[in-house]
Amino acid sequence: MKFTRSAKFALAAAASAALAVSLLAPAQAATRSTIVIHDTNALTSFNSGQPDTNLTINGKVGNLTGIGFYYINDKKNVVRNTTFGDFKIVKNGSTDFRIAYTVNKGLVWSDGTPINAVDLLMSHVLSSNAYSKSAGLGDPDGDDTPAFDSNGYGGTYSDNIVGQPVLSADKMTLTLQFKQRIANWDLYGPGPSPVHTLVLLAEGKKGLQSVKDNEAARDRFFAAYNSKNTAVLKSIGKVWSEAYDITEVNNSTNPLLWVGNGGFTVDSAVTKSSVTLKTNPKYNSGPKLTGTIDTVIFKFISDGTAAAQALANGELDVYSGQPTADAVAALKKLSNVNLIGGINACYEHWDTRVNAAPGQPDYNGIFKGHGGKGADLRKAFLLSIPREEINEKLIKPINPNAPILGSTFIAPGFDGYERLVANNGSGFYVGSQDALNAKAARLLKKHYPSASPSNPVKVTVLVPGNNPRRAAQFALAKANALKVGFDLVGDVQASWSPKIQLSTYDAQFFAYCPSAVTQAGSNANFQVGGGNNRNGINLPALDAILNKLQLPMDNRTFISTIIQAERIIFAEGLTSGVFLHPAVTAVNKNLKGIKPSPLSDDVVWNWWEWGY
């Protein structure tokens, strides 16, 4: 089961708990049709499309269980999946832009039900603010959570879609109309969802049904969708938003949850330990399985050194995570693996709260409000984060060339980056740490004249738990911030991602991992209604600038637009990028086909090629 949605960022989370290496079953003892993949993070849900479950590991599992019109390869290129279907522009007007998506005939879900374009309509339900409101499912921009707790609302799709998608007479083609040409239009189309299973689950069914019954259930979904039957749609929304938020799977788990069209289906899961997937025998929606793998096991180990030892013991086939320097040193000593390095697109950053997130109680902390005192104190706080020291001590031992980030929109090396950082206001946060501390102290004392290391101002920080690198990062930040006059009080939470939105916290730090490369990819972090705007940012001038990124433009215009946006972001002290995550993947020498991607899918984007 995979629910696709508009291109977004996923969060790189910390594992819920470390797994003792002694509990791992040796990979080498398994048949060579099994691949055991390490991940730092423990799975929290089988639906990564919700704000609180938008984590990289959840998305990785989903990647194996569903596939649509395209995938993104290790070069960050969009590759069309013509086995599933085709899509093309059918009207290219400046105020009437239409794309038709056609599903190939003969494709089936893992329960044997034929796939058609009705299965694409869930994407609209999950992404259109207008549909949610008109169907009585709630306002995604309001304080109350809508019936579908989707992270896909807001942004390019919702802002530009016109009316409802149009279904062809044979129900194999869906045509979308946008009010203008949009940038990266090929990434904002619909993906398939097994809507019949959502209906059956909402109706209380406990097992797989006949194809005839499944098609009748899909017809009921289509009828409810067309008529905007609020009661039926809300019952489906409850299933979509809650039923997949499980971490334990066994023989008693309802098999309707695992219907998908990917190469693998979920077989079992052990909370904070592992997820096992088996080959989908009815898979015919994508590239043929050319390898020898019929079982995929994700093992969750937060300690990089322990994971390296597990790899050495043959208990893992693929190591991929957030390594410490010690873990990398251990990996380099292994003779039975190939080590693949590089730079990941995931970026570490510190964020500050401005106001309450939707549905949360008022925020009355130190950073409250745009402009004035709130902005001064946010900037002072971000100046006190010792980015250079963090980079030198935690990242450069792994990647000696690791840069400090001057933008959270594009990375160093991107065409125009130097022009961007020279003009976007990031220079305010650059200099020796002593100079930055002095600047921070001046801003702090402007509002708290008595603030000092012996009389510090408290800042409550959400700290991702069970991650040694994050613990070390917070310790460095806490020590330096105290020199300025801030007392960073860390609340360490293993399951931290749902807590980002809480008004309890003045600041958080974690990583965003893009699932695709789009012009408007960072908009959701800062715009009103954006799926990742959980710090109460509400700046109409910034929203207007970010909206321009939805339109096709040349590189120079793109950079100029980001400059305008980041000048506001840095002047308000909303975020500060620290480093790009170093990419370290270690692979069993006998395993072929592992080609790590810098995007959030990492090693799992090409599962059909894996084999021994």
Predicted regions and their residues:
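Long beta-strand-rich cores associated with HINT superfamily self-processing modules
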Residues: 587-612
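Extracytoplasmic/periplasmic ligand-capture domains
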Residues: 2-3, 74, 101-135, 255-258, ...
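Short amphipathic beta-strand and strand-loop transition segments with alternating hydrophobic
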Residues: 82-92, 162-167, 266, 584, ...
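Secretory targeting and sorting signals
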Residues: 1-29
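Short, hydrophobic/aromatic-enriched beta-strand segments in well-ordered soluble domains
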Residues: 34-39, 101-105, 172-182, 276-281, ...
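Surface-exposed binding/hinge segments that line
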Residues: 140-241
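N-terminal lobe/hinge region of extracytoplasmic solute-binding protein
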Residues: 38-93
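Alpha-helix-centered segments that form part of catalytic cores
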Residues: 234-269
